[in-house]
Amino acid sequence: MVKKGSSGRWMSEHINDEFVKKAQKSGYRSRSVYKLIEVINKDKFIKLGDKVLDLGAAPGGWSQVAIKIVGKSGQVIASDILDIKPIDGVDFLRGDFTKDSVYETLLDITMSKKVDVVLSDMAPNMSGQSSIDIPKSMYLCELALDMAIKTLTPLGYFFVKVFQGNGFNEFVKLCRSSFSFVTIRKPKASKLRSKEVYLLTSKLKLT
C-alpha cells in the first residue's frame, strides 16, 4: 500500500515536472517522449521513410514521435497489452507481448519487410520490490532483444529501457554479442533517482 505522504509527493512532482508541462503543451501523451527525442537528436537513429516497431507503446507518445519523423513514406507498428487511442498513420496491435500468439503475430507482420528501428519502453507492473521487479523487467528486455535480432535490418537500431540491478551487466553483454555498436544513454528527462537507462544498439552481427 502506498503511503499518503509518498503519493502526495509524487503528485506534486508530477504537476510541477517541466517535461510533463512540455508534453501537455506540445500534445504528446507522455513525458517519456523527451527521453526518446533527446537520443534521436544525438544519435539520429530514426529517419524519414523508416519502418519502426514500438513495443510497450501505451499511451502512444513514442509512436507519436516516430510517425512524425518517418512520415507517410515510413511505417510505425505499435503494440501494447493496454489499448491506445488511435494515432494517424500508426498500425496498432493490442496484446500481451509475452504470449506466443502476440509475439508470432508481430513476427509475421514484420517478416515481409525488415524494420529499421525497434523501440522498447516496456516495463512490468511495479511492486516496489526490486527483487521482483528487476527480473520481470529483464525478461521483457530479453524478449524485445530477441524480437529485434529477428526483425531488424543489418544496420537497424534497437533502443530499449533497462533498469540497473541484477542482470543488467549480463543483458549488456547479450547486446554486445549480437550488435557491433552498443551504448548507454541516460536522458535528462529520466529522473536522476531512477535506475532506468536506455541502451542503443546497431550493426547486427550476422551469424
Curated annotation (Swiss-Prot):
Recorded hits in Pfam families, A to Z, give: FtsJ
Checking CDD domains in the record gives: AdoMet_MTases
Q: Where in the cell is it found?
A: Cytoplasm
Function text: Specifically methylates the uridine in position 2552 of 23S rRNA at the 2'-O position of the ribose in the fully assembled 50S ribosomal subunit.
Q: Which NCBIfam families match?
A: PRK11188.1
Family statement drawn from the similarity comment of this UniProt entry: Belongs to the class I-like SAM-binding methyltransferase superfamily. RNA methyltransferase RlmE family.
Under what name is this protein listed?
Ribosomal RNA large subunit methyltransferase E
